[in-house]
């Protein structure tokens, strides 16, 4: 087999594999099978998200250590992909709380252009699936970003603000806990400063250290909420 044919062969099967598991349900399939039933009184939390969640446990493993926290972030994912895998990666684990942090990759058009209302709708659908399964919900704002290194032609500021406004209003109307990372972390250009995210999108350890007490406060609020 010549070199060009071999490359084409590899690319074909890589694309075919992605098409067969668009939502990457296989990523956590084995891990999920090993998760035990919740212990009595356990306040299990699943973190559902994209690379910002995925990289969190790698950047600050101590935050997750010894806690009933399950990280189910997958780098690059859009809200549609998360919605497809929500049952396997959240509901099946029987948490008390799910923390949803999503939307930045939709704004970046990782899977092509998306209507902002559809991005919001995917997050709302995850929240409603959780509620139907007696799981408390924390809806996180999209983090600040004023540019994407991998999509330099896109200015994300207006899209992020619009989705965050929809999420905040939706959470208030439906009794979900809203976690406003944006206000706490945005600089005067509606982005993340280099100390919080070297590439302007993915938090540094310092960035995650700002997020950690905020998310734990939100989880505590969700646990005592009526919804």
Whereabouts are the PLM-identified features?
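Glycine-rich anion/phosphate-binding loops
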Residues: 77-84, 114-122
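Charged, glycine-enriched surface loops/patches
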Residues: 116-140, 166-176
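Sec-dependent N-terminal signal peptides
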Residues: 4-13
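Catalytic His-Asp segment of secreted/periplasmic serine-dependent ester chemistry enzymes
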Residues: 9, 20, 143-227
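Structural recognition of the beta-strand scaffold that forms the well-ordered cores
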Residues: 44-49, 69-73, 97-102, 137-141, ...
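Serine-esterase "nucleophile elbow" of acetyl-processing enzymes
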Residues: 18-97
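Active-site segments of SGNH/GDSL-like serine hydrolases
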Residues: 101-107, 127-160
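Cell-envelope and extracellular/periplasmic
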Residues: 72-75, 102-103, 111, 186
């Amino acid at each position: 087999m010549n070199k060009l044919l071999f490359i084409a062969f590899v690319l074909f099967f890589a694309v075919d594999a992605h098409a067969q598991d668009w939502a990457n349900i296989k990523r956590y399939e084995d891990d999920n099978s090993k998760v035990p039933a919740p212990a009595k009184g356990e306040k299990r939390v699943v973190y559902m998200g994209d690379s910002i969640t995925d990289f969190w446990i790698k950047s600050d493993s101590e935050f997750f250590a010894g806690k009933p926290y399950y990280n189910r972030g997958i780098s690059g994912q859009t809200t549609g992909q998360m919605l497809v895998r929500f049952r396997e990666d959240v509901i099946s684990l029987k948490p008390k709380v799910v923390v949803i942090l999503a939307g930045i990759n939709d704004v970046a058009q990782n899977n092509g252009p998306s209507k902002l209302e559809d991005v919001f709708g995917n997050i709302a659908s995850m929240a409603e699936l959780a509620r139907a399964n007696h799981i408390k919900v924390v809806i996180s704002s999209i983090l600040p970003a004023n540019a994407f290194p991998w999509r330099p032609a896109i200015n994300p500021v207006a899209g992020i603000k619009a989705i965050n406004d929809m999420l905040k209003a939706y959470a208030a109307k439906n009794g979900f806990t809203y976690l406003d990372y944006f206000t706490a972390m945005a600089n005067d250009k509606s982005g993340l400063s280099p100390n919080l995210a070297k590439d302007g999108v993915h938090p540094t350890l310092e960035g995650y250290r700002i997020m950690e007490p905020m998310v734990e406060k939100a989880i505590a609020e969700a646990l005592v909420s009526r919804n």
